[in-house]
């Protein structure tokens, strides 16, 4: 006898009819039991009339989301230079009746869109910056550059900004129709890839009236995160020396590049003596202009990561001393330039459970066989040979146990947000299995139908979760109490950028904004937002 697994059911391929009937009976019992039992300690939420309104609105306006995400994909822009991306989201929200204030926290491409009045205030994060040098043709399962040196949406922020905005509008529609009191805010946060936007939102007190903030990120899995992230510090070290002819009078010069190299050597020896979970990364944006000139100027750029910010700070403080030593050895002048810094993300158990209950209620994205055909060549290009090629399940977290600090992975600027207001983070499978972030495969897929379908699904997760928070003040009270207790146990949070100036575009990207190649020349027509009124 041979068994095959098909979805949630077991099918027999051989055997008598009585055995097949018995199999169907026990399979049905198993499915009923699974549906009746809590998943990962959380029961599926309840579909209320308010949630039905939001879900129906999102289904009806799915095309607007796809058009907006497509517009942003075709206009990829680096952090703090996301003028078209920010503008199209602002236009979308204005068309839907939101009040929009731009230039938030001193950033031209930042904004806050608000609707409603009074408490509670539920916020949603939106991101829309692209990554440098990731230009890639849409839907092509092989590397194919569109514009050499142009940015590309390798982290799916064209989806992030769009479907966060769609969720905010859906919440507003439900609040209007059902007379719900309170305020919904969409935080347009630029420059996430360099960990700037939300860090400086926290510094400037932008979240001071928020009761909870919801967020999400595109990826290869469906989940409601109950995990932390690595803390990080982002800084440059500039060395100033003295130019001279490198052949005829090298003794008259003082090499800034020598100082950079000596600092890097010292940092590499340091690695043995820091915690193994730490990460020390660097590149040299400027190492001189010509070999026959003693470099009078050179700079090195460092990212320092660790499970907790206090560990990061220890390494950064040591790094400054290494830099000072390099300057002494080369008789150059050292300049330490902080850019930004973030703590580790602080999960909130109360909100994670509410979020996951609503994710279970809505379900995973309704992918079809056609979606699988779209995803398959991308998974195969990454040696993922077995389907399904789009995730059909939720990632498991044990929401009843205390979380652990991260020991690997990346860093996020909304980590700082999570220490000042309760947060929950969602993810949906916008990408084929095996797709790494920040890759050409990711860029190529972030404009395809499966990504749009997953985007609408996560909008439903966030809308349903927000409506639960509006309906039950006790949830917000408990989430805030948990945040206070977490700060007392793991903090208190000290803003790592409180004495740091907002970085310039050139400081972050080592190029002037006008020098960044453009993918779409001229003005691409905006999506039709008339149906949002």
Question: How would you label these PLM feature ranges?
Answer:
Residues 61-62, 69, 73-76, 97, ...:
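Sec/Tat-exported extracytoplasmic proteins
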Residues 72, 113, 124, 157, ...:
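Divalent metal-coordination and catalytic microenvironments
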Residues 45-153, 158-183:
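Acidic/His- and Gly-rich active-site-bordering loop/insert found
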Residues 18, 37-41:
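Sec/Tat signal peptide C-region and signal peptidase I cleavage site
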